[in-house]
C-alpha cells in the first residue's frame, strides 16, 4: 500500500487541515522540517528525502473554493528535483476538460476531480475521454459519510445519493482511480471509514482505491490496507511524527487486502 503525503495550500502557504473547517486552517508546523512553518517547498522536499515518499497529493484550497488556481506555486512544486517516482496529484477544483488541462499545465501528473466541485458525470466522462483515464483521480468527497455535492450535481443524481452509487456513476464515466475523502475526519485521528472502504473494494474490485482522513498511527494504515485500500493520504500523522519512513517502506511491500499481524483485532 502506498502512503501519500498531503499538501494543503492556501494563499501559497501549507496549512494544517482539521475536520474540513477551512476557515480555521493554520500554517502547518511539521516534525519533518522544524522551523519551516507553512513552507510547501520545504515540505515537498522532506516528503521525498526524509520520508521516502514516492508520490504526493496537493490540494489548492483557493481554487477549490472558487478562487484562482495557484499556478506559480504548483509549477514551483512540480519542477522541484524531488525524484518522485509516482504521481503528484493535484486537486484544484477542476470540473471541465479546460480546467483539467490548466492543472496539468502546472505540472500535475494526475488531476483530482472532486465531487464537491463536479457539475455532472457527463463532464467527468468528457474529462476522462480527452485527458486519459490514467491521469484522472475521482474524489468522493464526504462529510461524516454524506456526499458533498455541487448544487448542479444534486439535480443530476437525484435525492440523497450515497457514496457507492456515486462511485458507480464515476466508474461508468471511465474512472479507474478513486479517492474516498471524508473531510470531517481530516486531522482528527478518528480513523478511516473501514466499512465504506471494504464495501467499495467488494463492489469495485478493479479500481485503484485511495482513502484519506482520520489516520492517527500505523495501526490505522494497517487496517485500511486490510480493508482493501491501495493507498492512504496522510498529513497530520506525518507532521506529528507518528508515521515514519520505516512505516512507508513496510507498507509499500504489502499489497492491499493483506492481513497484518501487527493489527490488534
Segments and roles (model prediction):
Residues 2-10, 56-58, 86-92, 111-113, ...:
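Hydrophobic faces of well-ordered beta-strands that scaffold small-molecule active sites
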Residues 14, 18-68:
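N-terminal beta-alpha supersecondary unit
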Residues 123-130, 221-265:
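C-terminal helical cap(s) of enzyme catalytic domains, especially alpha/beta-barrels
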Residues 62-68, 96, 144-147, 184-190, ...:
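Short, small-residue-enriched loops and turns at beta-alpha junctions
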Residues 87-111, 126, 195-234:
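Catalytic cores of alpha/beta
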Residues 49-106, 194-197:
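N-terminal active-site wall of soluble small-molecule enzyme domains
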Residues 9-30, 104-186:
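Conserved anion-binding
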Residues 36-49, 96-101, 158-169:
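Short, acidic/polar
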